[in-house]
């Protein structure tokens, strides 16, 4: 009877910076390289593998073997540990749509570096106009007293973001359509702080309009109520502090004043740094 050793059910959560690094490594690959591989860094907690960083592993794939610069990978991992000790090896990544014949050989190396490494593939060829992301774990297969092998089994994978990453992604989305519309600027600068407040307020008003429309449709029996949405709205109402309009206006104006003070101080520091740089350059030129 054959035996199958299944690892824990895992969910892989990938941060956008990891995907950007993989695409960047693919764009910088050697002309004779068909695909690029590398190490995934992150953490594992309660069946969730969170991938927060990665780096490229130089390698060459031949018909019957794989050559990889393992010393380079070890040195780079040690350097990363000095910066962020919480990021450990959780698996490896490769560009392409599918698992290749060499994947099992590469996976054996990472199985020695961590427990149950995950394998992430990113379709950089944009098949179907999408950059497909897949994740796998290696399942051990074998017959008692006989040969053993492994099989890559797909697992759940999703993209997650921290709040600063969401801001960066929203800024990147503003560059969509630049090539198709030559009149649009090719670069996008971050908005000023007050402009961000205005933009966030407009989005909040739009969301409130959707919520009000949903509540009115439920009250007029045009739409069936959902308990999950109702509980979420109730929690939202309870989270709002009980204050009058004047109290809210006073609190808001106080926060705006603090924001303006921070912006003013930031501009002063920026001006001083620019002045110091010019004075330093002038002094060096005179000497």
UniProtKB/Swiss-Prot annotation:
Superkingdom classification of source: Eukaryota
Keyword Cytoplasm appears in the UniProt entry: yes
Gene3D superfamilies xref list: Cytidine Deaminase, domain 2
Biological process terms in GO annotation: formation of cytoplasmic translation initiation complex; translational initiation
PROSITE patterns the record matches: MPN (PS50249)
GO molecular function: metallopeptidase activity; translation initiation factor activity; translation initiation factor binding
Pfam entry (one): JAB
SMART domains xref list: JAB_MPN (SM00232)
InterPro entries: eIF3f, EIF3F/CSN6-like_C, JAMM/MPN+_dom, MPN
Subcellular location: Cytoplasm
MPN domain residues: 12-142
Keywords, in A-Z order: Cytoplasm, Initiation factor, Protein biosynthesis
GO cellular component, one term: eukaryotic 43S preinitiation complex
HAMAP family, per database record: eIF3f (MF_03005)
Function: Component of the eukaryotic translation initiation factor 3 (eIF-3) complex, which is involved in protein synthesis of a specialized repertoire of mRNAs and, together with other initiation factors, stimulates binding of mRNA and methionyl-tRNAi to the 40S ribosome. The eIF-3 complex specifically targets and initiates translation of a subset of mRNAs involved in cell proliferation.
Assembly and interaction partners: Component of the eukaryotic translation initiation factor 3 (eIF-3) complex.
Family per similarity comment: Belongs to the eIF-3 subunit F family.
Protein name as annotated: Eukaryotic translation initiation factor 3 subunit F
Origin species: Anopheles gambiae
Lineage of origin: Eukaryota, Metazoa, Ecdysozoa, Arthropoda, Hexapoda
